[in-house]
């Protein structure tokens, strides 16, 4: 799957807690390194969207000021 595919999957989730559960599940089940990298990028992107109040951003377009709040 691509980063965009994972991001669309993660956008169905509206809470950080649920996102972390899905992230943990995928982290243990995926074996391909490129798949893991794509999933990590999408999960981080979705975390940024959630901490910004639910605003949606294009991939690579999250403002630097938002990343400060992502844990």
Curated annotation (Swiss-Prot):
One Pfam family it belongs to: HHA
Gene3D superfamilies, A to Z: HHA (1.20.1280.40)
GO cellular component terms, A-Z: bacterial nucleoid; H-NS-Cnu complex
Keyword Transcription annotated: yes
Keywords from the UniProt entry: DNA-binding, Transcription, Transcription regulation
Molecular function terms from GO: DNA binding
Phenotype when the gene is knocked out: At 0.3 M NaCl up-regulation of 1 gene and down-regulation of 6 genes was observed; a double cnu-hha deletion up-regulated 134 and down-regulated 5 genes, most of which are thought to have been acquired horizontally and are also up-regulated in double hns-stpA deletions.
Entry keyword annotation includes DNA damage: no
Site positions per UniProt: Interacts with H-NS: 44
GO BP: any one term: negative regulation of DNA-templated transcription
Homology family: Belongs to the Hha/YmoA/Cnu family.
Comment field (misc): Expression becomes maximal as cells enter the stationary phase but decreases later in the stationary phase.
Function: Modifies the set of genes regulated by H-NS; Hha and Cnu (YdgT) increase the number of genes bound by H-NS/StpA and may also modulate the oligomerization of the H-NS/StpA-complex on DNA. The complex formed with H-NS binds to the specific 26-bp cnb site in the origin of replication oriC. Can complement, at least partially, the absence of the Hha protein in hha mutants.
Record text on subunit structure and interactions: Forms complexes with both H-NS and StpA.
Name assigned to this protein: OriC-binding nucleoid-associated protein
Organism: Escherichia coli (strain K12)
């Amino acid at each position: 799957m691509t980063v965009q595919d994972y991001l669309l999957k993660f956008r169905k989730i509206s809470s950080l807690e649920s996102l972390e559960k899905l992230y943990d599940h995928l982290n243990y089940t995926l074996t391909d390194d490129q798949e893991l990298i794509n999933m990590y990028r999408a999960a981080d992107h979705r975390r940024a969207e959630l901490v910004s109040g639910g605003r949606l951003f294009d991939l690579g377009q999250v403002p630097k000021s938002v990343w400060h709040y992502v844990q």
